[in-house]
Every structure is written in structure tokens, then in C-alpha cells.
Amino acid sequence: MFQNADDVKKFIADEDVKFVDVRFCDLPGVMQHFTLPATAFDPDAEQAFDGSSIRGFQAIHESDMSLRPDLSTARVDPFRRDKTLNINFFIHDPITGEQYSRDPRNVAKKAEAYLASTGIADTAFFGPEAEFYVFDSVRFATRENESFYHIDSEAGAWNTGALEDNRGYKVRYKGGYFPVPPVDHFADLRAEISLELERSGLQVERQHHEVGTAGQAEINYKFNTLLAAADDLQLFKYIVKNVAWKNGKTATFMPKPIFGDNGSGMHVHQSLWSGGEPLFYDEQGYAGLSDTARYYIGGILKHAPSLLAFTNPTVNSYHRLVPGFEAPVNLVYSQRNRSAAMRIPITGSNPKAKRVEFRAPDASGNPYLAFSALLLAGLDGIKNKIEPAEPIDKDLYELAPEEHANVAQVPTSLGAVLDRLEADHEFLLQGDVFTPDLIETWIDFKRANEIAPLQLRPHPHEFEMYFDV
């Protein structure tokens, strides 16, 4: 939106901007913010903050950190009462001035620089498709003597027998793709989200109800370069959640909020370009893929068990990655085939449209780290000419047992992928994009803050199974 500090100053004055919202991303992937009066904001100055209070950052004895604005990300916040300009910032060490190695946006910036340094390509495009659910209410608690969650939605299949205000037209389990209103209760809400996305600079391509009951949705927008695509995804999630909130609803990108129905994934489309020319197309190759694209796929599939520590980084992620709910649990590639973890979309003979789609990820993690890790895995495949296993152009869910035994599967838990990341991360260290410190911090944080707390607590379903032993 802006190219320099003078542009920002002029906009603030001309548009009577009242506040500037300073935004940055914590290590797990949630945007943080504090707000300055616009009169106190100097786009040439750094902002200080306490890094020890941010998840995954600094210890208390070295807590001071500084923020530098990325003025290209400035957007007017559509939800604040007083006119507010949101700006994403990079994090730096206040003493050395160096980029902070645990700043997710700095990781993405380094990934783009490393790509250019390889000579393989100069641009990587990423197009995430993040699914989400919209509920009317959610209640949950975990205490010493109880643990529960309760979701409700006027469109939920479980409400067909509800007594109050029941006019039918509930979405059946796995029945949400693509019925028209009134079965689709959320067409207007998605339209409102889409218009807000457009006003914020994202180019919406389509929106629809997804397969799941209770308002599962997908809104697709145009791809972007790596760092910008991660920024776009954070903006997308912010707008989805706030439009839902404004309408008395609540939106979640949790991978598996509902037992017995489809989870919410985030298919990630990717392509490499050099000098304005696409590198993934060859009309003679399988599915129109070039050797470069095939090796890129080989790298991602080889490293997928460790990659999932960034692309599917929550305990809940692995409730989605199970057979039977259209989740891509098979680590193979194929054209058109949605049962494969890596799909080659049919794009005709247009070289510029050729891309690969990694279908395993979800939106519960940090997009800056996830996209950077995917790029580095793909580049490792290109540099080392890693051949993927032969493509499988049949329904992988219906393979005979002897065939299925030869198909690699995604790991089944967060603990398993963290173990794999611990053993397989050399490809992430190339170009100093990820550092050993970041990887160690990520693994330790996930084990201590997500795996260990669940190991300490009995699950409610255990009472169904074991109370009367």
C-alpha cells in the first residue's frame, strides 16, 4: 500500500487516521499487537516490546526486543471504531540490530532470499486454501473434576430434533458440498467476508459451503509470493473471525472441531518462477510437470514426516489426518486425485497455471514457518534430484491391502512428527533460514505446552470406556 515513510505520514494526515496498530507474529503463529496514537507514530523509528511475554521468544533476562515496520503491509482496519492503520513489523535484536532468528516473518524473508541465491528460481508463489467452521456458540472447560466442550450451530445436523425455532434445512454430516440456501445458511455471511477481503486488497476467486455440517466454509483468494502469502493468510483469518463475530457467530480454523465429520484443511498451491517465466510446466511430462516440479514434489514427499511439524503442528491436526474423512493421509502424488497428499490440478496447456498442491496442511500453525519449510523441502528435492515414488492414479482409499502396504502414510501424532523433525531438519538450515535454535525451541515448546498437558489429563471418552472397569 505504501512505499516509504512519507507516503504513510501523508496518508495518516490526509485520512485523519487516529491510531496505528503495531502487529507481529509469535512463534506458534498468532498475530500480536499494541496500539499507538497516530500522532506518536514515527515510521522511521523502531518500537520496543517485552519479548519474554511472547510465546516462544526471549527469556526474562534478555527480554528487550525492537520492531521495524514493513510499510508495504499497511492496511486500514475495517473493524475498529476509530480509523486505525494496521502495519506488520519485523523483529530485531535491539543491541546488534540483527534480524531476530525466531521472528516468523524474518524466517519467510530469509527463505525468499535463499531461493534467489540458489539460482534455481527467483520467485515462489503460494496459494493456501484455508477451510473453517462457523458456529453459533462454543463452550469448553478443563478442570480437576471435569472436562468438556459443547458446540452449537443452527445448521448442525444434530439439531434436526431441536424444539425451538426449528425450520429444518440442516446440513447433513458430510452433506455441505454445494447445496443452495436455505440449506446453505451462511451464503450471506461468506459474501460479507468476501467483500471485506476485497476491500482489504485480497482478490477473491470463489467461496462456498464445504463438506462439513454446521457452516464449514472455504473462501479462495489469489496466490502471492511467500512472505506476502503468509501475511495474506493472517489477514484472511483476522477478517473471517471478525466478520463472524460482528454477526453474532464465531469462526474457528481448528483442524477437527467436530467428531464424525470432515476436518478443516489448508491445501497449499505452490509454483516456482524465474525471470517472469514458470518453471513447473513441461507438456511432455506426467500431468504436464517439468523435471523441476517433479523433483520439488520429491523433496516435499521425502521430508513430509518432518515437514508436518510445521504444516500440521497441533495435537488436533492428527484427529483430521485419519482415513474416512477425505483427509490426504497417503504420501504420494497424482493428477486430479484428491486422495493423494500431493495433487497436480488440471490446468490445461497454460504454463503459467501449472502448480502443485500439497493437501496435508491445516491452518492451525504458523504460515511463515510452514511456507518456508515447504519451499526448503522442495528446493532440497530439486538440488538433489529426488524422485518421488510413481504416481498413483486411482482411489487410494480403495486400494487392496497388499497395494496399500506399499504406500507411505503421514505420521499419526504430533509427537511422531516432532521426533521426525528432530532427526530430519538439515534441509531447513540451508541459507540460515531456520536456525538450530529455532527448531529446538519449536520442538521443546510443542512438547511442553501441547503434548504434555494432554498426557496429564483424562479424556472424557475414557469415562465411556473405563469407568466401570
UniProtKB/Swiss-Prot annotation:
Required cofactor(s): Mg(2+)
Binding site for Mg(2+) 1: E129, H267, E357
Keyword Cytoplasm on entry: yes
Disulfide cross-links: none
Pfam families referenced in this protein's UniProt entry, alphabetically: Gln-synt_C, Gln-synt_N
Major enzyme class: ligase
Single Gene Ontology MF annotation: glutamine synthetase activity
Superkingdom as given in the UniProt entry: Bacteria
Residues spanning the membrane: none
Protein name: Glutamine synthetase
GS catalytic domain residues: 104-469
Catalytic activity field: L-glutamate + NH4(+) + ATP = L-glutamine + ADP + phosphate + H(+)
PTM annotation (O-AMP-tyrosine): residues: Y397
Gene expressing this chain: glnA
Binding site for Mg(2+) 2: E131, E210, E218
Keyword Lipoprotein on entry: no
Changes seen on gene knockout: Grows on defined Evans agar supplemented with ammonium chloride as a sole nitrogen source. However, double deletion mutant glnA/glnII is not able to grow on this medium and is auxotrophic for glutamine, indicating that both encode glutamine synthetases.
